[in-house]
Amino acid sequence: MGLEAVVNEIREKGRKEVETIRAETRTDVEEILVDAQTRAAGIKASAQEEADRAVTHIINQEASAANLVVKRQVLNAQKTLLDQVYSASLAAVGDLPAEFQEKALTALLKRAVKEIKKGVVHANERDSPVVEEILSQLKMFSGYTMGAPVDIPGGIIVESNDGELQIDYSYRTFLDEIWESGLKDASDILFT
């Protein structure tokens, strides 16, 4: 399954969850408004003039409070869903087939060698053997050595031998860049 399909599936799931949450919060708002109207009717019966002011005041307060509660719940739900989409996307990229991983790692190494000719390459434990094999097979990477595994979901981190330059080509870095640039678009798609 491609990343786009996974993202679309997650978006659709997110959209459905938001609709469910919105329906639940509408019920809460209606209950709060009904409660406010009942209280307002009691006040109006005992003192009409004071009750008119109290009714207006209470209804406005309760409606505002209910709207704030609803907005807070919706925003929290949206944030949770966006976090789930992000995590699922990161997991989906890490779970792509081995052939894809090998091609992606080779492309990232070719990109890195343009900036750092000699250095240490770090990958996660799963990808380290693949990276070592790529480094040993292609002469263009003869200036690279394999470093200790690092805690990244995939991709590589290349560090110059003197430690002054480090390039982070981890999948998380790429996803973060895409995520930041596409967050508004994703939010619009999921929640409108």
UniProtKB/Swiss-Prot annotation:
It is a peripheral membrane protein. Keywords: ATP synthesis, Cell membrane, Hydrogen ion transport, Ion transport, Membrane, Transport. Its main location: membrane. It comes from the Archaea. Pfam families: vATP-synt_E (PF01991). GO terms for molecular function: ATP binding; proton-transporting ATP synthase activity, rotational mechanism; proton-transporting ATPase activity, rotational mechanism. GO terms for biological process: proton motive force-driven plasma membrane ATP synthesis. InterPro entries: ATPase_E_C, ATPase_V1_Esu. One of its GO terms (cellular component) is proton-transporting two-sector ATPase complex, catalytic domain. It is found in: Cell membrane. Belongs to the V-ATPase E subunit family. Has multiple subunits with at least A(3), B(3), C, D, E, F, H, I and proteolipid K(x). Component of the A-type ATP synthase that produces ATP from ADP in the presence of a proton gradient across the membrane. This is A-type ATP synthase subunit E. It comes from Methanoculleus marisnigri (strain ATCC 35101 / DSM 1498 / JR1). The gene is atpE.
